[in-house]
Amino acid sequence: MGNAAAAKKGSEQESVKEFLAKAKEDFLKKWETPSQNTAQLDQFDRIKTLGTGSFGRVMLVKHKESGNHYAMKILDKQKVVKLKQIEHTLNEKRILQAVNFPFLVKLEFSFKDNSNLYMVMEYVAGGEMFSHLRRIGRFSEPHARFYAAQIVLTFEYLHSLDLIYRDLKPENLLIDQQGYIQVTDFGFAKRVKGRTWTLCGTPEYLAPEIILSKGYNKAVDWWALGVLIYEMAAGYPPFFADQPIQIYEKIVSGKVRFPSHFSSDLKDLLRNLLQVDLTKRFGNLKNGVNDIKNHKWFATTDWIAIYQRKVEAPFIPKFKGPGDTSNFDDYEEEEIRVSINEKCGKEFTEF
């Protein structure tokens, strides 16, 4: 690297530092005094279910007053309590209302009633990366790199706020109308200084230290990035088997096999991300995220242009207009029932 290039890289890293310091101030204000109860259910027309989970569903809704479409996440308080997800749910809302980044889905409103908790988010009409990846089979390396770069920047932002994301997978990455990523589902995200011990995540994406019940840190997100890049470029994850226990054995073994079409730069990056030894894993060393950003596989990536969303996306989802749900699967519809008596009031006071 010549002197000029080194100087440019140095000044870029300085301005990133400044940007993140300012971002942290903004985040902390909202983190310390979270917004509450900014809308109510009868202000929305419910249109269609976009996804379901163990304690709720996500619906496309239309805000009556503005005509805007949103994705409304509806969580049944009693089910959240039964599944011991109170802490995770409170975390999700508190984090979402405080963050602000181009590749994070925006929380527009949140409120609760006797039965449910509601998070109303920007509607991202392109659907999950998961469905596009399965349809296409696998992404070319430039295509995978475009998405990976956005995740790298997003993790750099979140980690600077002491947030661990812990749930990276193609199902949680939505593609917007410009072809960029919107990270959704902060149900496992957590503000942690130092280490944490909770077992959570998706089997294929779990870092070895989580499986081995060790205290772990932000480095689990960089491991998961390795899994995601591999899955995007191969069409299948690096560690898979029928039973979670078999997946865990493969993950902990530290052995990865690469498809023959992977470039040598990609294999090198993945060996450094899917690194069982935490003292060697990229993202967790003294240069932090810069070991990843400066890696040869990302040599063509203009990080600032990605952040500014100025790079042309490799793929734009088909979109028939506002409220189009053709990029989502169909689910059985169910009435939203609200009890006349308050359920689990105490547990969710701070929501």
Swiss-Prot record:
Activity regulation behaviour: Allosterically activated by various compounds, including ATP. Activated by cAMP; the nucleotide acts as a dynamic and allosteric activator by coupling the two lobes of apo PKA, enhancing the enzyme dynamics synchronously and priming it for catalysis.
Residues the record lists as Phosphothreonine modifications: 49, 196, 198
SMART domains: S_TK_X (SM00133), S_TKc (SM00220)
Residues lipid-modified (N-myristoyl glycine): 2
SUPFAM superfamilies reported for this sequence: Protein kinase-like (PK-like) (SSF56112)
CDD domains, sorted: STKc_PKA (cd14209)
MF term (GO), any: protein serine/threonine/tyrosine kinase activity
Enzyme Commission designation: 2.7.11.11
Primary enzyme class: transferase
In-chain residues carrying the UniProt-annotated modification Phosphoserine: 11, 140, 339
Residues modified to Deamidated asparagine: 3
Residue intervals of the AGC-kinase C-terminal domain: 299-351
Knockout-associated phenotype: Frequent early postnatal lethality. Survivals are runted accompanied with mature sperm exhibiting defective forward motility.
Subcellular location: Cytoplasm; Cell membrane; Nucleus; Mitochondrion
Pfam families the record matches: Pkinase
Catalyzed reaction equations: L-seryl-[protein] + ATP = O-phospho-L-seryl-[protein] + ADP + H(+); L-threonyl-[protein] + ATP = O-phospho-L-threonyl-[protein] + ADP + H(+)
GO annotations of cellular component type: acrosomal vesicle; axoneme; cAMP-dependent protein kinase complex; centrosome; ciliary base; cytoplasm; cytosol; glutamatergic synapse
Binding site for ATP: 50-58, 73, 122-128, 169-172
Domain of life: Eukaryota
Consequence of changing residue 328 to A: Reduced catalytic activity and impaired inhibition by the R-subunit
Role summary: Phosphorylates a large number of substrates in the cytoplasm and the nucleus. Phosphorylates CDC25B, ABL1, NFKB1, CLDN3, PSMC5/RPT6, PJA2, RYR2, RORA, SOX9 and VASP. Regulates the abundance of compartmentalized pools of its regulatory subunits through phosphorylation of PJA2 which binds and ubiquitinates these subunits, leading to their subsequent proteolysis. RORA is activated by phosphorylation. Required for glucose-mediated adipogenic differentiation increase and osteogenic differentiation inhibition from osteoblasts. Involved in chondrogenesis by mediating phosphorylation of SOX9.
Subunit and interaction comment: A number of inactive tetrameric holoenzymes are produced by the combination of homo- or heterodimers of the different regulatory subunits associated with two catalytic subunits. Protein kinase A holoenzyme is comprised of two catalytic (C) and two regulatory (R) subunits which keep the enzyme in an inhibited state before activation by cyclic-AMP. cAMP causes the dissociation of the inactive holoenzyme into a dimer of regulatory subunits bound to four cAMP and two free monomeric catalytic subunits. The cAMP-dependent protein kinase catalytic subunit binds PJA2.
Recorded family membership: Belongs to the protein kinase superfamily. AGC Ser/Thr protein kinase family. cAMP subfamily.
Descriptive protein name: cAMP-dependent protein kinase catalytic subunit alpha
Protein's organism: Mus musculus
